[in-house]
Amino acid sequence: MIDFKAIIAKVATGATLTRDEAASAFDGMMSGDATPSQMGALLMGLRVRGETVDEITGAVSTMRAKMLTVDAPADAVDIVGTGGDGSGSVNVSTCASFIVAGCGVPVAKHGNRALSSKSGAADVLNALGVRIDITPEHVGRCVTEAGIGFMFAPTHHPAMKNVGPTRVELATRTIFNLLGPLSNPAGVKRQMIGVFSRQWVQPLAQVLKNLGSESIWVVHGSDGLDEITLSGPTAVAELKNGEIRTFEVTPDEAGLPRAHAEALRGGDAEANAVALRSVLEGMPSPYRDVALLNAAAALVVAGKAKDLKEGVALGAKSIDSGAAEGRLRRLIAVTAAG
């Protein structure tokens, strides 16, 4: 059993934990062996000092070891954001996921209910008629039969129940806000991850490299969006062929018009579901444009498109042919089938 007193004492001095120490500490928390005071002390100690790549890598390895997994194709992708950007935007990554699935790329999407906004991925999918309370086996069937499946985080990470109350009491961001997107239950090796702060763009790409990912974009919009934004440049860290490089992208290079973040303001789950359906039904809007931009990046990650401009063209075809909307209808049917 981990010596929590020693771990907390180490963190209190400003020292960093090794990958193995972090893995053991998080195993203790998620197994229920740590007291709420110990968990709170460790989480805030890490937050105040700043979590390291090794600490995040160790924590993610523990979270992955304890999750309930899903069988998905090796070429499956995930488009996910950390949330916590405070934007209250429409559900960009969820909409983009259907566009990507409509291009023939299997999607294993991981997500949760809203934390900082009115509508998270789980909320809007539920409002669209997709059942989210399904087993891991059922999710795998969705990916196979519908081309897209949604993994509701609480179902796949039952050990999180031991840290949930402490997180609620702390009521501030902790390392756990970063761990969810890095702990996809389908074990995808290809992801586009949006983060709430630019400081995490390069480090999270390094964490995923440490954990064996193959093709990754970690992104943060200049307006604070945890997606690729329409309002200006977006910072990107790309993992490809074992190397990480950082750069910026803009909507201009994808052939899309710019739009202010206010144009992407969302509402509750029902309102966001109506907006998402309108995109999949072909209605032009800034929401369509931002969903296409993020889908394009995911298609680059998947190896389906050579650049954002080609990805946008493929995504537009997915929408306008009805393929993307067809994936939504199929997902609703497969989840309802039990």
Swiss-Prot record:
SUPFAM superfamilies: Nucleoside phosphorylase/phosphoribosyltransferase catalytic domain, Nucleoside phosphorylase/phosphoribosyltransferase N-terminal domain. Binds 2 magnesium ions per monomer. Its cofactor is Mg(2+). The keyword Metal-binding applies. Signal peptide: none annotated. Its EC number is 2.4.2.18. Mg(2+) 2 binds at residues 226-227. It catalyses: N-(5-phospho-beta-D-ribosyl)anthranilate + diphosphate = 5-phospho-alpha-D-ribose 1-diphosphate + anthranilate. InterPro entries: Anthranilate_Pribosyl_Tfrase (IPR005940), Glycosyl_Trfase_fam3 (IPR000312), Glycosyl_Trfase_fam3_N_dom (IPR017459), Glycosyl_Trfase_fam3_N_dom_sf (IPR036320), Nuc_phospho_transferase (IPR035902). Keywords: Amino-acid biosynthesis, Aromatic amino acid biosynthesis, Glycosyltransferase, Magnesium, Metal-binding, Transferase, Tryptophan biosynthesis. Anthranilate 2 binds at residue 167. Mg(2+) 1 binds at residues 93, 227. Anthranilate 1 binds at residues 81, 112. Pathway: Amino-acid biosynthesis; L-tryptophan biosynthesis; L-tryptophan from chorismate: step 2/5. 5-phospho-alpha-D-ribose 1-diphosphate binds at residues 81, 84-85, 89, 91-94, 109-117, 121. Catalyzes the transfer of the phosphoribosyl group of 5-phosphorylribose-1-pyrophosphate (PRPP) to anthranilate to yield N-(5'-phosphoribosyl)-anthranilate (PRA). Belongs to the anthranilate phosphoribosyltransferase family. HAMAP family: TrpD. Homodimer. This is Anthranilate phosphoribosyltransferase. It comes from Rhodopseudomonas palustris (strain BisB5).
